[in-house]
Amino acid sequence: LEHPAGEAQVDFGDAQFYENGVLHDGKYLNVSFPYSNQGYLQLFYGENIECLLEGLKAIFEYIGGVPTRLWFDNTKTIVTKILKEGSRNLTEKFMRFREHYGFDTVFCNPEAGHEKGNVESKVGYHRRNMLVPIPRFQELRKYNEELLVKCNEDGNREHYRKADFISKLFEEDKKNFLPLPATEFDTAGYHIVHTNGYGRFYLNNGLHEYSVSPKYANTRVVIKITSLYVIPMDENQNEIVRHKRLYGDHKQQSMKWLPYLRQLAKRPGALKYSGIYNIMPEDMKKYLDKCKRSERGKILSVIASLTEKNGFENAAQTVTQVLCYDAVDVDSLISMHRHLCSEIRELPPMKTESRIPRLKPTKTDLSKYDKALKKWGKRTC
């Protein structure tokens, strides 16, 4: 198919990547421009409506305009039903996005992926040239910004068929783009969920569990969903906690302990009846059991402070260490946490050369001092 300048094709591909040393089986959104053969990609943890819209929005803003027409396959992310006469029922979120940016859409016939052959080829090209070997980075958001620059630089080569550079042909694409809207489009999804007695809720057909706060137990909560985060919000639309969005078709849980620890610190007597006690790490339960009842509120308050400062995992590690020393006081807890989380590295023992003489240890006999002190005391009495 011949495409006029300004049109684009869209498709997802499979990709692996390491973020902070953790391997992810993710997806990457490809947008290709058949006229010039310019292409762009964005990496994501999965393939959903938030990934699609965030990726398109990022690419539109980077290239400074909106393609006149976008070609898609019949992905469930967009298409809810294919009608007999060839038209499609589309998701409400995508229709609002399309209306906001003003582009037209074309959907390929079922089993006819060749109708968007340019982007099919670009999916493979991007994988071979930008995702092999498996990329490693610290933060996905920043890496996606780097990918846009790399894709732009990739246009500085000759077109496979036309006697010109891709970057120059892409200027013709740009001349036909629609202008970016004056107002920004919110790509996040907003949903109302019902929390259980522990102030937690489920997404993805009950597979993914997220916490809110004991304050929001057995109630309805508005949640904001992006490709990266799940964010429960209060009645004033303020963020309560922020979870990294869970991906995968298996049971997972994301627990933010800070609101629960703060609540328990105010009512330590309800610790074992709250339901939260049962899901605490075993060492933390043992530690709290050893504490005096009168000290539990203060201990929980300190654990909450340590969690806020360096995360629950580090706070739990601190509890495990002080438990080894059978120390259940607040000062030991704070001191151990400072030791474990200090940026000052603990130096190993210094090794001495064999030529340096070894001194025998000197033992001090304090009994003579005791005798002298007793005699001195007698003389003054």
PLM region spans:
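Active-site beta-loop-alpha junctions of metal-dependent nucleic acid enzymes
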Residues: 42-69, 90, 247-251
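Basic, flexible linker segments flanking DNA-binding modules
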Residues: 1-17, 82, 89, 167-174
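RNase H-like polynucleotidyl transferase catalytic core
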Residues: 94-95, 99-116, 135-137
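Protein C-terminal end segments and domain termini
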Residues: 230-381
